[in-house]
């Protein structure tokens, strides 16, 4: 039986002057995202050795659930908020669950 889950590890370096705004935006959108159908896990963290590096661990039940998530207005606002607040592009790694 194939596993259709989409598992992502996303890491981005935040410009220090944008850190407070980004963290506030994460706090505002987190409960909305976790309540979405198909969002199995969304866990935002920062690196202990670099608090300006934000790392998200995300698990969606399927690609469709992820696509639906990305269409939510609060997700679009999140990305608009972080525009210009990161050092470069985030690194997105797609993972596979061990069976």
What are these regions (language model features)?
Residues 2-3, 24, 48-49, 58, ...:
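Short hydrophobic/aromatic segments of transmembrane alpha-helices and their interfaces
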Residues 19, 23-27, 54, 65, ...:
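Residue-level detection of beta-strand scaffold positions
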Residues 17, 28, 49-51, 73:
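Short alpha-helical
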Residues 1-6, 43-52, 80-99:
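Glycine-rich beta-strand-turn "strand-cap" elements at beta-sheet edges
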């Amino acid at each position: 039986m194939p596993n259709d889950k989409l598992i992502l590890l996303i890491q981005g370096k935040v410009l220090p002057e944008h850190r407070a705004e980004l963290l506030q935006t994460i706090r505002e959108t987190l409960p909305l995202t976790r309540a979405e159908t198909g969002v199995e896990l969304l866990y935002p963290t920062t690196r202990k050795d670099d608090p300006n590096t934000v790392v998200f661990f995300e698990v969606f039940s399927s690609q469709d659930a992820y696509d639906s998530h990305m269409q939510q207005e609060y997700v679009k606002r999140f990305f608009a908020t972080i525009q210009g607040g990161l050092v470069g592009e985030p690194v997105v790694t797609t993972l596979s669950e061990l069976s």
